């Protein structure tokens, strides 16, 4: 377990799931979070009184396949627990240490982590759009082999990101509604800005999915034209 301090009162603990299981002290609903992490199913946040906890499941496309980074979080008072068996959060915390404002609340810090998770997603989605445009251009020149396998990879990828952003929108809404009374105006504003940004990413994925459908329809129309030519030759 590693400990980080925003100041003398605000503590962040980074630990593995096994360490969280054995953690002693007053952590209401700890068992609920532990169950939610075996395994992590999706992004969510739950609140009970002054206790907030949840899980994150972040898709990452690697060599055509979708993999996931998962972790849990538990916030109570001035203590934030981050639970992960990998090294992703350690890297995030190392970066955040350099940019944390002098007066930073725990909710602000949590938003900063969530913002870091999506900071490069706009670029990634733009790259996906460019790749689809290239596929469309090549399709007009020559019908490629294994077209459906290629399209299937993109469809799985976009479905994963579509679900992810939808979950993040719900999570941000829950943060504002369930904790609205104890959040400061600045904290509410940060969560709203985060929700707006995620909604734009969600809309971008929607457009990519529609673009993919158009490419598939173009492919089918080209196949139909090709088959009609063959049939006309055979008929003659």
What are these regions (language model features)?
Residues 79, 116-123, 156-159:
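A ubiquitous short alpha-helical element
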Residues 108-132:
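Well-ordered alpha/beta subsegment
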Residues 145-236:
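Membrane-associated alpha-helical segments
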């Amino acid at each position: 377990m590693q400990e980080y301090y925003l100041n003398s009162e605000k503590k962040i603990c980074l630990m593995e799931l096994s360490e969280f299981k054995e953690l002693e002290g007053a952590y209401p609903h700890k068992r609920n979070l532990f169950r939610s992490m075996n395994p992590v199913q999706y992004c969510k946040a739950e609140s009970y009184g002054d206790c907030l906890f949840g899980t994150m499941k972040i898709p990452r496309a690697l060599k055509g396949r979708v993999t996931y980074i998962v972790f849990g979080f538990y916030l109570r008072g001035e203590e934030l627990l981050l639970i992960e068996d990998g090294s992703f959060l350690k890297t995030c915390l190392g970066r955040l240490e350099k940019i944390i404002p002098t007066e930073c609340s725990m909710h602000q810090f949590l938003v900063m982590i969530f913002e870091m998770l999506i900071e490069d997603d706009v670029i990634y989605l733009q790259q996906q759009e460019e790749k689809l445009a290239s596929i469309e251009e090549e399709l007009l020149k020559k019908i490629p082999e294994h077209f459906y396998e290629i399209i299937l990879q993109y469809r799985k990828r976009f479905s994963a990101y579509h679900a992810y952003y939808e979950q993040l929108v719900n999570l941000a809404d829950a943060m504002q509604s369930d904790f609205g009374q104890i959040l400061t105006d600045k904290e509410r504003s940060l969560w709203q800005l985060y929700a707006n940004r995620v909604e734009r990413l969600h809309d971008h994925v929607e457009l990519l999915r529609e673009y993919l459908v158009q490419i598939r329809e173009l492919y089918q129309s080209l196949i139909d034209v090709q088959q009609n030519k063959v049939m006309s030759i055979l008929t003659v």
